[in-house]
Amino acid sequence: MTSATSPIILKWDPKSLEIRTLTVERLLEPLVTQVTTLVNTSNKGPSGKKKGRSKKAHVLAASVEQATQNFLEKGEQIAKESQDLKEELVAAVEDVRKQGETMRIASSEFADDPCSSVKRGTMVRAARALLSAVTRLLILADMADVMRLLSHLKIVEEALEAVKNATNEQDLANRFKEFGKEMVKLNYVAARRQQELKDPHCRDEMAAARGALKKNATMLYTASQAFLRHPDVAATRANRDYVFKQVQEAIAGISNAAQATSPTDEAKGHTGIGELAAALNEFDNKIILDPMTFSEARFRPSLEERLESIISGAALMADSSCTRDDRRERIVAECNAVRQALQDLLSEYMNNTGRKEKGDPLNIAIDKMTKKTRDLRRQLRKAVMDHISDSFLETNVPLLVLIEAAKSGNEKEVKEYAQVFREHANKLVEVANLACSISNNEEGVKLVRMAATQIDSLCPQVINAALTLAARPQSKVAQDNMDVFKDQWEKQVRVLTEAVDDITSVDDFLSVSENHILEDVNKCVIALQEGDVDTLDRTAGAIRGRAARVIHIINAEMENYEAGVYTEKVLEATKLLSETVMPRFAEQVEVAIEALSANVPQPFEENEFIDASRLVYDGVRDIRKAVLMIRTPEELEDDSDFEQEDYDVRSRTSVQTEDDQLIAGQSARAIMAQLPQEEKAKIAEQVEIFHQEKSKLDAEVAKWDDSGNDIIVLAKQMCMIMMEMTDFTRGKGPLKNTSDVINAAKKIAEAGSRMDKLARAVADQCPDSACKQDLLAYLQRIALYCHQLNICSKVKAEVQNLGGELIVSGLDSATSLIQAAKNLMNAVVLTVKASYVASTKYQKVYGTAAVNSPVVSWKMKAPEKKPLVKREKPEEFQTRVRRGSQKKHISPVQALSEFKAMDSF
């Protein structure tokens, strides 16, 4: 980097012909094309055709001569205007003129005799010399542009030095104003240079340096002002010196990028994918061997050594403080499984040694090996996501606590909170590096490491700003300085958070967030029952933070997709969580804390709090289900612990899972599938009876167009949910656990309540007392059977340990659920029929004109479209004569009773 007093030094060899900008490349390309075309004329050697002048060659020679003349004119103009490199530019122009003349003569002679290899060789040498001369001229012109940029940089450096040497605040304001003007000019010139740079790395470096200059310039004034106002506070000098150093490094970065001499990412340690990811990738590649050349002595030690290195890295992650115990156990189990898979694979290679083709057992062993490494990767990703979910939660709290302590002027307290803040910053950096270690996203890893480096260097300066404020709590300048560093810290944390999110999977994030929210919900319930207000408040805050992060990340993720049914479903789930579920949860937390904090503990509805907490978990789970809707089977396989992982971490005190008795992490649905065959047969009989009742409902609702008829819509919804519940009793369907079945029962109850409201409105308008009483009676049945279904929804398989053998049984609870669903289905069928009859009675007595706003619209469903002309089968081409059918008059009531749709919904 140049100092304010040193001359401008160009880190660029003028003799080098390396093209560094797109402009030089664009200007040179036409001449290269013309010369190449000319050189390649008659490149096939002597021919039997009559010798003579080549019209094409003469035309090309003339175009080369004209292009050379254009370069000469532009070069002379640049040499006149240039303050730097004037002599070099003039010499380059003369060289182009000389080589151009040589090329003109050589090309003319070649055009006259294009079959002469001697003349062709002379022209080729002249062409090379001309291209070199023109390239050198363009590169020198490019250097002149860089020199102008470096001149701007020197002016900015001098202005920066002036700001640093300001003696009072008025002097600082004046000098900073001049610095700002020069900054604007420099930014404009640097932006132009950035667009011209050919090397993407240099463009990135230029952009980063410009960003750093702009970012630190905002802190330069307040840090300098704080130093001038409070020179006796050591922290102010540290702040000022830090900002000056950052600005100087940014200026040096612009200089290096402009000259394409930036330090490489390798030198900065920012390059490459994660170390653990790279090791796993390499291991996966190394296990594919040729049995013909396999040697145990050669390959076994190498593969085992590579695997142990990977396992060492995995062990470090497993032993980290934020890694959950269950996750640690899974990582250890996967490491052991990978070890065993490698030994099995090596054994198969030994069995196949010398064979040309791999046998099936060997291919199976290779597939098993890759599957085990994939499983290990997944557990490592989830472990990292555990860290991210915990560390990147409420990232501003340590900073706000530090600032509040500083405002109070308590320096001792500030130093204590500064240590907490430093540990928080170190944790962010550590977790960010962990995320990098298992990521294959090279560009993303680079951004995360750069952002983490910025966090690491900024942390001490935030503490210095807090120490300044603590020493001078009444000083507005100290407060402004603190605000600037606070804003900068928050921006940098956001940058780091977004960078980390970019290199991690949204599926992993949702899976882990769901588990963590479940843990926190259970902690909240325990704290509530124990009257622990602090734990309740803190854990509820964590739940709100986790939910807010889920909403933010998923909304951002959906911006990557085109709007459609998928995004609508996902955004609908996030909207429900943010606008309905979380406000209710916050309200219940406030009520609980107020009740527990009162001098005399006040009674409150504990179940309301539990329900509100459960809805948060359900909301996040629904978002995850919606996001996974478009995943391929392979992607879902990679998230194969979707079913197991979400439940086996729950405690025995969990309100969510007190009815979910699990066997080795299996879901309740999976356990239902393990019922004895006798019980399965009896359940199948009950399901068959249920299906008969369902077919009646299908036939009834299929008659009607459901647009404008919410009774039909609700009947369909209830039928669909009841089908899922009966499928659960057979170990099938989308419902996995008792909690899912309970949720389904709640949805049916909600639908039943809405149907009750609509049907009662129909009954109120019905003048026929008999029809009205029938309809109300059926509605009472719906309410009764909904309640029964809610009770029976706590269906679970009972697991007994008899003589060391696990015995699974669940016939009674399953048949009760199916019977309740069948009864409810029958009540819904009768309600639909009675609602229609009640509606027709009203219209029959009063006429349709009297109905201003009917409750629901009863319109027959249009039949399926059929071709107007029936296509004959090939074998039925003969003309047929049939007797015309006799027309019959059919009453509307008879038509309605006979109408039956072919397809159930």
Swiss-Prot record:
Q: Which GO terms describe its molecular function?
A: actin filament binding; beta-catenin binding; cadherin binding; structural molecule activity
Entries under Pfam families matching the protein:
Vinculin
UniProt region (Disordered), positions on chain: 869-891
| Cellular component annotations (GO), alphabetically ordered | actin cytoskeleton; adherens junction; axon; catenin complex; cytoplasm; nucleus
Residues bearing the modification Phosphothreonine: 632
Its placement in the membrane is given as: Peripheral membrane protein
Where does the source fall among the domains of life? Eukaryota
Give the UniProt subcellular location, in the record's own words.
Cell membrane; Cytoplasm; Cytoplasm, Cytoskeleton; Cell junction, Adherens junction
Report the sequence similarity comment from the record: Belongs to the vinculin/alpha-catenin family.
Q: What is this protein called?
A: Catenin alpha-2
* Organism in which the protein naturally occurs: Pongo abelii (Sumatran orangutan)
Organism placement in taxonomy: Eukaryota, Metazoa, Chordata, Craniata, Vertebrata
